[in-house]
Amino acid sequence: QIAEKTDEKCMSIVDCICEDKYCFSNEKIFGMVVPTYFWRLPRIVAEYLGKLRIENCGYTFFLTSYGATTGEAGSMAKKIMAHNGQNFDAYYSVIMPDTWTPVFDLTNKNRVDKWLSDGKKQLKLVIGNIMSKRKGNFVDRKLYSRKPEL
């Protein structure tokens, strides 16, 4: 949805790794959208960020999706980028249903629909911020209530 609204292309990290594509330059907008995995970045994302080079891009952002909390995903991305002398212009988060089923019950359709609805609202705000090139850290680290009002 972000690529569609910003008229940009969408690439997977796996494809970038397979194509040995770690440098992005002169892009109008460069963003990464990744899941939070056990309150952290997935290892493949952390390793990719360690090799990533962003040069002369108009606006850069990092977005993490999360179930219960973003944990340290945003701060990990920021720390890895800083280690390489780089930074994203903005950091965002969007709620999604947590899929770790031993703990989170996904059988309640109303609850899942509520999480998806909240996520769509957050994504709409994020897209607006991206379009206006808003800078800052907008990652929500609060523990999301698993019992939303229905």
Regions found by a protein language model. Give the residues of each.
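FMN-binding flavodoxin-like domain, especially the glycine-rich phosphate-binding loop
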Residues: 2-20, 24-34, 38-150
